[in-house]
């Protein structure tokens, strides 16, 4: 029996679990377009999908914000139908042998800062900035970074008066412990600074392959989060960023220096990385690391290693020799229109494949490729949701019992 929602969308197979709900592949039967359908049981103890859909609607029109096509109730479920997206940055990171080149990290950083800035401009903070919640588009939007999952988002100021929420302590740890800011670990109410600090850890994760506080063992989940917090606080930023351009340490130091209700200087942070990008002689061609690799399930570890070495070699040779050796700019770099990258949607003349992997249909979709790079999955869902690997909780700094959020562990 064919299942439909909104009398227009055919429900397909389950492709994962996002925040507070399951996600299915769907089809808009009026035009034959594939969509993502998020379902939440109306009888759930703490319904969130309606709230999340309202936040998505407030965000509509922003670059890198998924389009919401329909919201409503169908039988025993709350439903949100949205634009189908490509793989998450976590999936692509795994596909690239868990190491991104500096060029790819900087291309991503520019767009990710802008996504966070846009959400903040709409009076919300995301509170769960992590690679799983940034997805690439499909087709002509294959170079565009999207931000998803507003299940933990919170309004930080009044939309009319811009009155900031008050400073509070003893708050639950909301989000993902691996990328949580120091102040979040300390139980301080989150604000704009925390989203940006989390992004700094994401960027270093892309550089390093893993963060120093990953893989810590503990008898209980509470003790594990305490160990993550202790390790994070005892690791100086300069040590975390050692061996990488100083801009990454500058970024994190800037974020940690912000006061609770400060408005971050997003332009400064973007320009910090743009100046580094230009000094490295990189080109805004939107050729990411994954565009230079062979897609498919039969790629061996040796092939992946060889491709990564060849990619790094190509990157070194593609740099503009005239740009080498230019000293770092002194003081804060000021935003300049000349230094801004072109829109990711602008077609480029290079021959590399700069879109997300091509859509596949029928029997091809059922093949178990190493990182699910087809249109069916991942879609608006984190790879860690699909595999159940998370360092996430809503853990109160003053509670003995630990109420966990939608991410499980």
Swiss-Prot record:
GO molecular function, one term: protein serine kinase activity
This enzyme's EC code(s): 2.7.11.1
Active site: 128
Bias kind Basic and acidic residues: ranges: 300-315
Keyword Transferase: yes
Segments forming domain Protein kinase: 9-277
GO CC annotation terms, alphabetical: cytoplasm; nucleus; spindle microtubule
PTM: Autophosphorylated on serine and threonine residues.
Compartments in which it is found: Cytoplasm; Nucleus
Binding residue positions for ATP: 15-23, 38
Example of a GO biological process term: signal transduction
Region (Disordered) location: 300-409
Record-linked Gene3D superfamilies: Transferase(Phosphotransferase) domain 1
Regulation: Exhibits substrate-dependent heparin activation.
The organism's place on the tree of life at top rank: Eukaryota
CDD domains: STKc_CK1_delta_epsilon
Keywords: ATP-binding, Cytoplasm, Kinase, Nucleotide-binding, Nucleus, Serine/threonine-protein kinase, Transferase, Wnt signaling pathway
Biased composition (Polar residues): 346-358, 380-402
InterPro entries: CK1_Ser-Thr_kinase, Kinase-like_dom_sf, Prot_kinase_dom, Protein_kinase_ATP_BS, Ser/Thr_kinase_AS
Subunit structure as annotated in this protein's UniProt entry: Monomer. Interacts with per1 and per2. Component of the circadian core oscillator.
Matching PANTHER family: CASEIN KINASE-RELATED
Functional summary from the UniProt entry: Casein kinases are operationally defined by their preferential utilization of acidic proteins such as caseins as substrates. Central component of the circadian clock. May act as a negative regulator of circadian rhythmicity by phosphorylating per1 and per2, which may lead to their degradation. Participates in wnt signaling.
Similarity-based family: Belongs to the protein kinase superfamily.
Protein name: Casein kinase I isoform delta-B
């Amino acid at each position: 029996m064919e299942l439909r929602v909104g009398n227009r969308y055919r429900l397909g197979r389950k492709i994962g679990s996002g925040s507070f709900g399951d996600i299915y592949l769907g089809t808009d039967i009026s035009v034959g377009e594939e969509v993502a359908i998020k379902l939440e049981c109306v009888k759930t103890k703490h319904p969130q999908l309606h709230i999340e859909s309202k936040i998505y609607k407030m965000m509509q029109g922003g670059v890198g914000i998924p389009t919401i096509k329909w919201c409503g109730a169908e039988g025993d479920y709350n439903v949100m139908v949205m634009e189908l997206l490509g793989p998450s940055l976590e999936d692509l990171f795994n596909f690239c042998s868990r190491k991104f080149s500096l060029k790819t990290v900087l291309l991503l950083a520019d767009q990710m800062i802008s996504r966070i800035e846009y959400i903040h401009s709409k009076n919300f903070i995301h509170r769960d900035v992590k690679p799983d919640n940034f997805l690439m588009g499909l087709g002509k939007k294959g170079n565009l970074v999207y931000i998803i999952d507003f299940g933990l988002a919170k309004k930080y100021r009044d939309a009319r008066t811009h009155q900031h929420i008050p400073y509070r302590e003893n708050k639950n740890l909301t989000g993902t412990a691996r990328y949580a800011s120091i102040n979040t670990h300390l139980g301080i109410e989150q604000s704009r600074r925390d989203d940006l600090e989390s992004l700094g850890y994401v960027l270093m994760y892309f550089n390093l392959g893993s963060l120093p506080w990953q893989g810590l063992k503990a008898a209980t989940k509470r003790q594990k989060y305490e160990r993550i917090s202790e390790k994070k606080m005892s690791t100086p930023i300069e040590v975390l960023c050692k061996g990488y351009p100083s801009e990454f340490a500058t970024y994190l130091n800037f974020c940690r220096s912000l006061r609770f209700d400060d408005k971050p200087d997003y332009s400064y942070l973007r320009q910090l990385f743009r100046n580094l990008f230009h000094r490295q002689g990189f080109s805004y061609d939107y050729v990411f690391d994954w565009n230079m690799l062979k897609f498919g399930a039969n790629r061996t570890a040796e092939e992946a290693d060889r491709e990564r070495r060849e990619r790094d070699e190509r990157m070194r040779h593609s740099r503009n020799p005239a740009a080498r050796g230019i000293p770092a700019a002194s003081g804060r770099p000021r935003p300049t229109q000349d230094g801004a990258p072109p829109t990711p949607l602008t077609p480029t003349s290079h021959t590399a494949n700069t879109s997300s992997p091509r859509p596949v249909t029928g029997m091809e979709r059922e093949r178990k490729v190493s990182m699910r790079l087809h249109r069916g999955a991942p879609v608006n869902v984190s790879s860690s949701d699909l595999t159940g690997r998370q360092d996430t909780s809503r853990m109160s700094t003053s509670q003995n019992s630990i109420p966990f959020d939608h991410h499980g562990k």
